[in-house]
Swiss-Prot record:
Subcellular location: Cytoplasm
Inducing stimuli: In response to low temperature.
Alphabetic keyword roster: Activator, Cytoplasm, DNA-binding, Stress response, Transcription, Transcription regulation
Gene3D superfamilies linked: 6.20.370.130, Nucleic acid-binding proteins
Organism classification: Bacteria, Bacillati, Bacillota, Bacilli, Lactobacillales
Keyword Cytoplasm applies: yes
Gene: csp
Ranges of residues in domain CSD: 4-63
InterPro entries hit by this protein: Cold_shock_CspA (IPR012156), Cold_shock_domain (IPR050181), CSD (IPR011129), CSD_CS (IPR019844), CSP_DNA-bd (IPR002059), NA-bd_OB-fold (IPR012340)
Gene Ontology molecular function: any one: DNA binding
Record's GO cellular component terms: cytoplasm
Designated name of the protein: Cold shock protein 1
Region (Disordered): 47-66
Database matches in Pfam families: CSD (PF00313)
Length: 66
């Protein structure tokens, strides 16, 4: 698991970006958020996540808000 901070997240569109501790931005889709109910993130929120490779670059998986 990696630590990161939500750079931005658009709840209407269901995606955004997390900035990892290494300074790299990672795409996050709402389906990767591990919470009950409405899955959203807030700018500046701390999260842990797994990083996976996709056709479009790094993508977050198993995102857990802190």
């Amino acid at each position: 698991m990696k630590n990161g901070t939500v750079k931005w997240f658009n709840a209407d569109k269901g995606y955004g970006f997390i900035t990892g501790e290494d300074g790299n931005d990672v795409f996050v889709h709402f389906s990767a958020i591990q919470t009950d109910g409405f899955k959203t993130l807030e700018e500046g929120q701390k999260v842990t996540f797994d990083e996976e490779s996709s056709d479009r670059g790094p993508q977050a998986a198993n995102v857990v808000p802190q």
